[in-house]
Every structure is written in structure tokens, then in C-alpha cells.
Amino acid sequence: MAAISGISSGTLTISRPLVTLRRSRAAVSYSSSHRLLHHLPLSSRRLLLRNNHRVQATILQDDEEKVVVEESFKAETSTGTEPLEEPNMSSSSTSAFETWIIKLEQGVNVFLTDSVIKILDTLYRDRTYARFFVLETIARVPYFAFMSVLHMYETFGWWRRADYLKVHFAESWNEMHHLLIMEELGGNSWWFDRFLAQHIATFYYFMTVFLYILSPRMAYHFSECVESHAYETYDKFLKASGEELKNMPAPDIAVKYYTGGDLYLFDEFQTSRTPNTRRPVIENLYDVFVNIRDDEAEHCKTMRACQTLGSLRSPHSILEDDDTEEESGCVVPEEAHCEGIVDCLKKSITS
């Protein structure tokens, strides 16, 4: 998605000088032709003027069509992750306050994540698979916490965004299979590890529900921090034990999930990719951890996109034809989405 956004913004940045250049050329040709009129007969002057106006009109029409096409391309490919435009003077104080709030939220999230990481580093310094088991137990929690809150919002008519529910379920489904892989590798063999993971997950669930009700942006950023740590953890493990992993067989659950499982759901959580473009090949345990690591990177991208309200789209729904959506008869009201409980209550009262 970031790549698409870069292409879109780059296209628009280059296109405007092109339009200006075309118009300047048209102006030069128009003024030079008028200077030639004084040296031509009357009939030639009329012919030249007629042709000149025709050419100028064609150039301006091409420029207008070019601008229309480029603006529509920008609207269709916008992901919500592009930098915001510079605020005007009247809203500068509001923007500064919001920026301060965002920095505060992210600072708290980073502090909490680092604190949990230090605990895991202390308890699981030499027990890799047990650490992965605890990490995957925790990592899948926020997605069904998000769905719980969204289902509650749907009950009150505050939310009608099916894409979020589809993507979050696909994310929880992916993390569940990561957990099954770690269990097959023996990561849950100790009672203490299961006890710790389950109780952390219980606390994490209610904390995420509270954060998501208070500020979805903060909850999504916290989940992004967790997924980012998971990516770094697996990446370090691959670099340290890659050769050893290449000589070990892949768990059956991993082969089934990545090559013969529900590939629709596998595509659904990767919102930065087109469906059917990632099909892993699993030959050994190294391939399994490479794909788990890459899954965590996709989760990071999705969580980052979610931090902009209304920007998340299901990969498969993007491919749907607009005519098909209109014929389905399911019309989503523009106000049927909100950002936190305060925004939901305000919209329910004013609507």
C-alpha cells in the first residue's frame, strides 16, 4: 500500500508541472503566430487564426482530461497513510493538540511494550519455543478484542463496516495457526508457560477492549508495537539458527495451513497485497519461520493502516465490482462509523 501511495503522490507531483509546461508552450505558439499575421495576406491570416485556435483548444482539452484522470487515480488509490496537508491558521491549535495526544499515546504504548519485552527476555532467555508460544498466545488477543467492541457498536447501530470484521478475523485466524505451530514444536510443554500465557492474554484482552473503546488509534498502534516486536524476534532467530532450521522438518500443521488451508483467509489479513500473490512453499522448518516472520510484517502494515479511520479495506472487497455492490442493496450510511465511544455517543445523539 505504501508503494501504491508513493506512486500516486509521485504521479500527481510530476503531472502539474507537465500541465503548466503544455500551457506555456501553447501560449508561446499562440503569441508567435500573432506576430506572423502582420506579414501574411488576409485569407492566410484567417486560415492561420482558425488552425491556431483549434490547436490551442485541443491542447487545453488534453490538459483538462489529464487533470481529471490523475485526480480520480489519486482518489481511488488513497490508503489513508499519506502525510496530511499543512493545516491552516484557524485549525493550527487543534492540530497541535491532536499531535501532542498522538505522541502521548504512542509513548505509553512503547513503554508498555518494552516493559513486557524485558519480562519475556528475563523468563525465556534460553527457551525459544516457549517464548514463541507465549508471544503467539498474546498476539492473537487484540483481534478478537477489536471484533468484540465492533459487534457491540453494531448492536447500537454505531458501526456498519464489514471490512474491519473480516480483516480482524483473518488476522486472529493467522495468529491461531502460529500458536498451533508453536504447540506442535513443544512450546507449551511446561505448565508455568501455559499459566503465564493464559493470564497475560486475559488481562491483555480487557486492556485492549478498554483502549479500543477509548481510542481505536491507540489500540491499533499498541498492536502494531507488539507485531513489530514479533517480527524482530523471528528475524533474529532466523539469522541465528537458519542453517539448523533448514535441516529440520516442517510441522504438519504449518504445511497444511500455508499450502492447503483456507487461502481466502490467508489473503484477507494482508491488506497491502493483492489476493493470490503470496503462496508460500514449505520444505523445512526454516521456511515455516520465514513465513511466520513475513506474516508479522503484514500484520504491522494492516495495524498501521487501521490508525487512519475508515481507511481499511478487505483485499477481496477491493476486487469486487462497484456495480455488484450497488445491486446487493446493502447501503452503508455515511455516519455508521465512529472513532471511540465519545464519537459514537455524539453521533447517536445528533443523528
Curated annotation (Swiss-Prot):
Matches recorded under InterPro entries? AOX, AOX_sf
What cofactor does its activity depend on?
A: Fe cation
Tell me where it mainly resides.
plastid
The membrane topology noted for this protein in its Swiss-Prot or TrEMBL record is: Multi-pass membrane protein
Q: In UniProt terms, what is the effect of altering residue 299 to A/E/N?
A: Abolishes cyanide-resistant oxygen consumption
Q: What is its EC number?
A: 1.10.3.11
Q: Name the residues that bind Fe cation 2.
A: 175, 227, 296, 299
Say what happens when this gene is deleted: Variegated cotyledons and leaves. The amount of white tissue increases with light intensity.
Q: Name one GO cellular component term.
A: chromoplast membrane
Catalytic function, reaction form: 2 a ubiquinol + O2 = 2 a ubiquinone + 2 H2O
- Name the chain's protein: Ubiquinol oxidase 4, chloroplastic/chromoplastic
